């Protein structure tokens, strides 16, 4: 009798277990996908000035909500992973010409040149000089998507191919790209200035490329001639301060570090003969490179210490990171500068964001833009599941560049009017 009374309770118990399991799974999904996070306009850090007021009026994306895809877009990890594996959705194939420049040390630098597909909104000749992220080049999907959009908005685009990054271009000297070497980017900019003497420049850098372009502009005042503005997206500002955070498991940074190190090893070893071959006349600093340590490296810091710093003869990793980071050059940039990071970027620790925040509080030419979501170079947009081909980042950079071009045009017209009035008096 007791058994007969107890059996009906068993299904209820099992249903309770199932319900608890489903609830646990849903909780994990909500937490992992960050579904409870709100959508909001980006946080903006700037000084009140005529320029900042004009930008807020002319760039709607600065004050509108950035709305990522509903299901997964609020996860910085998924945004970053999709950028890393997929690049972009339905990426176009812009047509350009590859240019070759022989550097003073025998290295062969390359960049791709893309002509505008429409007239610019202010009618001027404007060239975007673009520096991609680590080990990237003009054939990467996120670069192709951005270039195509910029072309359609009237920009000529010059995209640097990092030294050693293109698989079909051999190194012609025992040197490849490093974290902050500006030689190749500077050579590309000088080529553009010489070939198109009437053009004005918009400087754009993504991730590591953001460090390079900011360092380039701050190295000497002459590098800012003909430059209308600069945009840096998702850089970390200081390799020295970032190295400790990049070894932490928080936000899986140690795992990302391992993946990036593995990719760098493959690139370096693909050029082992040009870099380390017995027939190569290489600098003394490379002579003692222990390739066995490169094979076993599991972090970018180990690779930088064993190989990368030696390309430029740095005596220590600390010296390499101090000299190659743009942080010590940012205060020397006088052209309008927009720094963009995502709050959920798993590669850039929040402590590093104090650098652009502090700079924007001191300099009227600097605006720091910090959306809640976007990951590392993701910034996908879309309604529910599938992302759009064009990202929020692509649109923001072009919108900002257009606004700066208009700002400069207005200043020029005001100056001309004042000159006419002075002549009449």
From Swiss-Prot:
Location relative to the cell: Cell membrane
Classification via InterPro entries: AB_hydrolase_1 (IPR000073), AB_hydrolase_4_CS (IPR000952), AB_hydrolase_4_sf (IPR050960), AB_hydrolase_fold (IPR029058), ABHD4 (IPR012020)
Protein name (database record): Monoacylglycerol lipase ABHD2
Extracellular side: 31-425
Regulation of catalytic or functional activity: Acylglycerol lipase activity is activated upon binding to progesterone.
Keywords from the named record: Cell membrane, Glycoprotein, Hydrolase, Lipid degradation, Lipid metabolism, Membrane, Serine esterase, Signal-anchor, Transmembrane, Transmembrane helix
Spans within the Cytoplasmic topological domain: 1-9
Membrane topology: Single-pass type II membrane protein
Annotated source species: Macaca fascicularis (Crab-eating macaque)
Gene name linked to the record: ABHD2
Superkingdom, taxonomy of origin: Eukaryota
Record field: catalytic activity: Hydrolyzes glycerol monoesters of long-chain fatty acids; an acetyl ester + H2O = an aliphatic alcohol + acetate + H(+); a triacylglycerol + H2O = a diacylglycerol + a fatty acid + H(+); 2-(5Z,8Z,11Z,14Z-eicosatetraenoyl)-glycerol + H2O = glycerol + (5Z,8Z,11Z,14Z)-eicosatetraenoate + H(+)
Enzyme Commission number, as recorded: 3.1.1.23, 3.1.1.6, 3.1.1.79
Tagged with keyword Hydrolase: yes
GO cellular component assignments: acrosomal vesicle; sperm flagellum; sperm plasma membrane
Transmembrane segments: 10-30
Glycosylated residues in this chain: 136, 410
Ranges of residues in domain AB hydrolase-1: 128-382
Pfam family, one: Abhydrolase_1
Predominant cellular place of this UniProt entry's protein: membrane
GO MF, any single term: hormone binding
Gene Ontology biological-process entries: acrosome reaction; acylglycerol catabolic process; medium-chain fatty acid biosynthetic process; medium-chain fatty acid catabolic process; negative regulation of smooth muscle cell migration; response to progesterone; response to wounding; smooth muscle cell migration
Family: Belongs to the AB hydrolase superfamily. AB hydrolase 4 family.
Catalytic site positions: 207 (nucleophile), 345 (charge relay system), 376 (charge relay system)
PROSITE patterns in alphabetical order: UPF0017
Function, in words: Progesterone-dependent acylglycerol lipase that catalyzes hydrolysis of endocannabinoid arachidonoylglycerol (AG) from cell membrane. Acts as a progesterone receptor: progesterone-binding activates the acylglycerol lipase activity, mediating degradation of 1-arachidonoylglycerol (1AG) and 2-arachidonoylglycerol (2AG) to glycerol and arachidonic acid (AA). Also displays an ester hydrolase activity against acetyl ester, butanoate ester and hexadecanoate ester.
